[in-house]
């Protein structure tokens, strides 16, 4: 039985940086900030639609979950508790920045039934991270990943982006090598989509940012799928989901509504 997620989107409120590639409200398709009642409503609805809640995680995505105000983070976590304790959902999955992980935060997550933590690494090149205004370093990613794994109660997920400003084939393969060395259970691979209203969009319009060839990115992602399979790492996402909002805001990059299928067709 495969696992599934019930997603609760937490907008840009938790992100301390506006990364060069990010227009989070475009990606999530919403500006609404969810509160406890929203979490309960979404979970209640899911109970009527999901076949096996024991294989379903309540997932807080869309922003940097551990960077939101502490009271708000606890509000959302507490709202989900009854569905785990009483209704036997599998647990809670969150995504966050690597520089917002600490023992204090992990203690809170552990005590509130968080079972999976995904870190937005994006690149394992400090040059690429700085060029794309990420606001953290490779060392931050490595430190956070190791700390998460040391608890023994969290599944580690890592997210990487392909084709960022200042990246190339060599940096992508270096990023993969360093991510694989951290032994995550899951990875998400997002080829860059250049969105209107972002710094990356401005660099693209000016000609300063020249993306890699689309076919080259497909080849790289195809290779990463093969390597992940060899290592037993589950690629749970490859490419942004098909979205009318994304398509309307897209200036360029590596978007296809069936991007994963394109890559799998190369193997």
Task: Report residues per predicted region.
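Generic structural hydrophobic/aromatic packing signal, biased to beta-strands
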Residues: 8, 80, 94, 235-238
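Short glycine-enriched loops at secondary-structure junctions
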Residues: 11-14, 190-195, 241
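Auxiliary Fe-S-binding modules of radical SAM enzymes
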Residues: 1-4, 199, 206-267
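Glycine-rich phosphate/diphosphate-binding loops that line cofactor/substrate pockets in enzymes
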Residues: 51-54
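Canonical Radical SAM [4Fe-4S] cluster-binding loop centered on the CxxxCxxC motif
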Residues: 1-38
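Conserved non-cysteine loop/helix-boundary elements of the Radical SAM core domain that shape
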Residues: 27-41, 47-49, 62-192, 196-215
């Amino acid at each position: 039985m495969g696992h599934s997620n019930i997603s609760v989107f937490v907008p840009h409120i938790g992100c301390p940086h506006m990364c060069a590639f990010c227009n989070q409200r475009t990606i999530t398709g919403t500006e609404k900030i969810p509160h406890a009642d929203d979490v309960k409503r979404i979970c209640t609805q899911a109970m009527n639609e999901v076949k096996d809640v024991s294989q379903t995680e309540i997932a807080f995505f869309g922003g940097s979950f551990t960077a939101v105000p502490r009271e708000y983070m606890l509000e959302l976590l507490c709202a989900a508790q009854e569905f785990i304790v009483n209704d036997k959902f599998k647990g809670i999955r969150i995504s966050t920045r690597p520089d917002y992980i600490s023992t204090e935060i992990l203690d809170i997550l552990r005590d509130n039934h968080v079972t999976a933590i995904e870190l937005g690494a994006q690149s394992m090149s400090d040059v690429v991270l700085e060029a794309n205004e990420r606001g953290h370093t490779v060392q931050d990613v490595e430190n956070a990943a190791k700390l998460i794994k040391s608890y023994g109660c969290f599944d580690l997920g890592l997210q990487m982006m392909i084709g960022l400003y200042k990246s190339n084939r060599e940096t992508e393969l270096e990023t993969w090598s360093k991510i694989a060395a951290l032994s995550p259970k899951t990875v998400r691979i997002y080829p860059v989509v250049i969105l209107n209203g972002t710094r990356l969009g401005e660099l693209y319009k000016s000609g300063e940012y020249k993306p890699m060839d689309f076919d080259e990115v497909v080849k790289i992602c195809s290779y990463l799928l093969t390597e992940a399979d060899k290592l037993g790492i589950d690629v749970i996402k490859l490419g942004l989901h098909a979205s009318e909002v994304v398509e309307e805001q897209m200036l360029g990059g590596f978007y296809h509504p069936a991007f994963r299928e394109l890559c799998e067709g190369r193997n």
